[in-house]
Structure formats: structure tokens, C-alpha cells
């Protein structure tokens, strides 16, 4: 996977300029983010202070937006805790003039939904579980996306540890992304589930504890699409880790701030006997990318193995 990396702080700021828009016959605004995680990174938000919710109207709004700005993508964070990823509770999207790694990923398995033979559909070859829909008629995409959302909200497959709800708490939702592709509308629907267990109290489909030294935070829209938004602490930690790796310092002697990376450091040294002062930073960047790929795999509800692929197909077959 082509995985760009970004190190960020904790505060969200937005430039002052506001561009009014009409999407789904309602008043929205566009602002550009100073973070610039990617080219022309923008926030699109509802004039009315309404809670974020993934529903049929969400797909209509996303497709209206890319109809206005066909060179932009736009997407929404999911609407449940753990898998949401947003620090804003207000109804909003994120967009920009950028092609993420997930957008470049090919279809792994094509699919035809009954009654929607005019919609190109399939499973995307990506660590997270993504259904891609493409059609020249955006209303058809809205109809099929809504059908898939409704089906997923109520779907349980115990053999894949997918439960629609436990004790009345809903677990299933979708992270949707829209774009134009060769003159057609396209939606990527990423299946999400926020169930927790004693073994994984932060989420079964969330970065597992072994990876928390790199990424512990929620996997939101930007990460889903393949851009690693990493905690700012890593900038100094990786520089310091490079020094101790080159010096072959025993992990027991690592500074306290680097102890969390000790097991990973041993894996890196075993994997890269050629490591030296000239290549250590490139090696670390590459290895962080591998960790982030595993982060996405942890967040995927259907794993990239035989059982996961079979489970994904069972869900698609259930959509009538």
C-alpha cells in the first residue's frame, strides 16, 4: 500500500474564509483547513447545528458536492463512537483535491446487486472492508447505498464476530466517500463496527494493543482512505529511536519514552541487519508504514483471509 504519513498535534483550526454552498437543497459552507493534511483539504459543514448521522441523505449530500466540485473527493466520518474519528460533533464532511491510496486500489471482486444491474459494484482490494459503487446516475447510487446501509445496520454474522447490537447498543455503521470517476459518480462504503471486548476494550475493529506505540487513536475518514495521521509525539521519538538503533543500545537501556518501542525496535534490527546511520530514517519510515497497514487491517471487519472473504460475500448475498 502507498501510505503517506503525517504527524499532527491535537487542535483543529480552520481558516476564516467561508464559501456558501447548497447541497441536498440545504445551506452548507466550505472552509479550508490550515492543517493541509493533503492538497486543498477542506471542511464542509451544515449551516444548521445538527448531529452527525449516516443516513440516506448523507449519500445525497456527498454526491451533490462532487457534482459541484468534480475534481474533489468528499467523505464523512462514521456516526458511532470508536469508529467515528472526528473531533467535531456538528454535521460535516471533509474533502479536497487529492487522490488517496484507497481511491487507487482496484476492485478485488465484482458484484451485481439484484435490481441494480446498471451499477458497477465490487469489493475493493484494501485492508478495510470497502464496497465500491459506480454509476452515471447518482440517484441510483443513493438508492443502492441506502439499501446497503440499512442491511449493514441490522447485520449479524457470529462466525466473523460481527454483531449488529449488544444490549441494545448498535455497532454497525459506514464511513462513506464520494468522487467522480471518468464522468461517473462513485461511492466507497467502508463497513465499520465498534464492538468492544475485555481483550480489546478500545474496540475489536480498532488498532490492537501491540500497535498502540505508533497509533492508538480512532481510525477516522482520513486514515480509512490510507493517510496515516500519527501523534505528534512520534516526531521526536522516531529521531531518538534512530539514534539508539544505530548505536545498537540494548533495549533495557532505552530512555523511558522509547520503552514502548522496544519490542518493535528488536524486530526492526532483526529484519534490517544493514541498518546504519545513512539509512535508518528511511527504514523507520518504511516500518511505520507497515505498522499503519496493520492498523488498517485491525480496523477491517472482514479480514483479508479465506474466512474474511467468505464472510464479506455472505453479507453481499444478504442484500436483497
Which residue stretches match the model-derived regions?
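Short, small-residue-biased leader/transition segments that mark boundaries at the very start
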Residues: 1-14
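Beta-rich nucleic-acid/ligand-interaction surfaces
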Residues: 81-89, 167-173
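C-terminal accessory/tail domains of diverse enzymes
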Residues: 122-320
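Helical scaffold of the NTase/Pol beta-like nucleotidyltransferase catalytic core
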Residues: 17, 49-74
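Catalytic or ion-translocation cores adjacent to nucleophile or general acid/base/metal-coordination motifs
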Residues: 57, 70-86, 95-156
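Conserved oxyanion/phosphate-binding beta-strand-loop segments in alpha/beta enzyme cores
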Residues: 16-35
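Residues forming anionic-ligand binding surfaces in small-molecule and nucleic-acid pockets
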Residues: 33-48, 123-127
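Histidine-centered divalent-metal-coordination microenvironment in nucleic-acid enzymes
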Residues: 40-41, 46, 83-100, 190
